[in-house]
Regions:
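Double-stranded beta-helix
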Residues: 1-8, 14, 83-89
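Conserved short histidine dyad/triad with adjacent acidic residue
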Residues: 12-33, 50, 66-69
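Intrinsic-disorder/low-complexity, polar/charged segments enriched in Ser/Thr/Lys/Arg/Asp/Glu/Gln
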Residues: 13, 35-37, 81
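Short, conserved beta-strand element in jelly-roll/cupin
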Residues: 32-48
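Acidic, low-complexity, intrinsically disordered interaction modules
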Residues: 38, 48-57, 70
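Loop/turn positions that initiate beta-strands
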Residues: 60-64
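Ligand-binding loop in jelly-roll beta-barrel domains
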Residues: 68-89
């Protein structure tokens, strides 16, 4: 089971929601098979993002994160829901 729910999927983007009740252990380090630009839509409170070998940083509305193919990264749970937009281009 995935730790998120896709709210909207198009050819250009995915709107994805991470629920406030998710178990933090489900937010594992991972790599994606393609480059991604992620836009933070609704960051809740205290949600963070971390690349491998870097310190985590707070997620803020409208923040853009460029994630390269096969780059290790993770999301760190905060309070409330986290909603992101993953641009497929």
């Amino acid at each position: 089971m995935k730790p998120y729910k896709d709210l909207e999927v198009t050819d250009e983007y995915i709107i994805r929601e991470f629920d406030e009740n998710i178990d933090p252990i489900e937010l594992m380090w991972h790599r994606d098979n393609e480059d991604r630009v992620v836009e933070i839509i609704k960051p809740g409170k205290g949600w963070k993002f971390q690349f491998e070998n870097e310190l985590p940083w707070d997620l803020e509305p409208n923040l853009l994160i460029c994630i390269l193919r096969h780059e290790w990264h993770r999301v760190i749970k905060g309070e409330g829901k986290l909603v992101i937009k993953i641009n497929k281009d």
